[in-house]
Amino acid sequence: MAGTVDAYRQRVRPGEYRTTIPKNKDRPMIQGSQIHSSLTMLIEYYETRAEIERTQILEFHVRFEQIHPFDDGNGRVGRLIMFKECLRHDIMPFILDDKRRSRYLQGIREWFIDRYELVDVVMEAQSRFESQIELQKLQKSAEFYQPEEYKEGLKNEDE
């Protein structure tokens, strides 16, 4: 039955490119038949860059989102690719939380006019991620460097 969840599930093919143009999108979408060639060109362009920095990763992400290759999960896949590329190029990775979702989406929409919003929200996310890593390092080093007398005292309190 058209318009039902079951109809949607039958149309969505995880891991395969979409074959239709998604409805309710606020931007023009490429045809399903153009997805493979568009992704190939995007990847080739990205991989031939002399240097990959945060801005190039974000531009790749925005263009990936414009291609919108799948029926569902494009944002999750795109953000996972960004995380992987940050690690690959020794850039502090980041996780975009729900609190910043609207700014992230606005930044994608405005990318070719003004890159500030997306770069800013990502820099905030990188800073938070780096702080979390540093906090974990401090906690681990505090556990590692505790004097033996202190550790013994903790054991005695537990008994």
Feature-to-residue mapping (PLM):
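FIC/Doc superfamily catalytic core
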Residues: 1-159
